[in-house]
Amino acid sequence: SPGISPSDKLLKSLENSQCKLTTDIEIVQSMTNTKFICVTGTNGKTSTVSLISDILNENSISSIACGNNGISVFKSLEAKYDYIILEVSSYQLEHIKYLNAYISVILNLTSDHLERHGTLDKYLEIKLKIFKNAKYKIINKSLDYEDKYYNFEVKDKDFLVNKAKINQLSVTHNNIIFQQTHYPIVGYHEALNLCACLAIMNILNLPLENIMSAFSKRNLMQHRVEEFISINGTKFINDSKSTNAESTLNALKSVNGNIILIMGGDKKEMSYKMLIEIINNKVKLLVIIGENKDY
C-alpha cells in the first residue's frame, strides 16, 4: 500500500528477509496486455486522467481512469479496455519497481510531501520513475528536463506541443477558443491539463476537432473550484481538492471579487510564501484551520 512509508520497520524487515514485495499496479500489469497511459504531477492529476478518459471514450476508444483517483486499478480487469488511464502519486511510485507504460506524463512539479520524501530532489527523483520503460515520455516544458522528452506548454495565448503551435486553438483567462467557439474553463491550470492531453492525443493521432468536441462535454471534478451555492450575491466555492500552496494559488487566480478564504489541513513541510501577494490583493478575510494553522 502507498500508505506505508519505505522507512516502516516491518517493511524493512520484510525486505531484509528477501520476501517478494509488489504493488497493486504491478499485479494488474502482469495480468493484462492493455496499454497504460500513466499520469503524475504535484497538481491536476485527477482532472487530467478524467479528461483523457473522457476524450478517448467520446471517440469510441474504450478506457478507464483509475489509480490514485479513488478507483482501484483492479477495476480495470473487470472489462476489456483499449487503454487504462492511471493516476500515479509519488507514494505509489516510491514502491513500484517495474512500471511498463505506453505513455507517461509529468504535468508539473512543485514542493510537496516533503514530510514523507525528505527533500525536493528526492521527490523529483521519485516522480521521474514514471518514465522508466515508458515508450513515450511527456513533460511540462517549464521543467528542466524538457529537452529530453516530448513536451507541452501554454505560452501567452498559444498551446504548444514539442514547440509547435496548435493552430486554431488559443486561451484567455477564463476561456479556450477553438474555431471561434468559446469553451469556459475554471482556471488557467485547466488549459495546461488540456495541453497535456493534446500531447497524448497527438501521439494517438486523434484529430483536434474530436478532442475539442469531447472537451466541451467533459466532466468537471467535484471539489475543484466548485461553486456549490450562491446567497445574496455571495458565491461559496469548494476547492478542497487543493492540497498544497500551488493548487490554492491557481484556484485564487481563477476567482474574482472580494474573497473570504478558508484554508488549512494536515501539516506539510512546504512554504506558503507564494500565496502572500495574491492573498494581500484578493482576499478580504482569511480563516485558517487545521493542523497547519500555526505553521
Where are these predicted regions, by residue range?
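Cofactor-binding loop segments of dinucleotide-utilizing enzymes, especially the Rossmann-like FAD-
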Residues: T42, N68, G264-D266, I289-E291
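Short, glycine/polar-rich helix-capping loops at beta-to-alpha or helix-loop-helix junctions
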Residues: S7-K9, M270-K273, N292-Y295
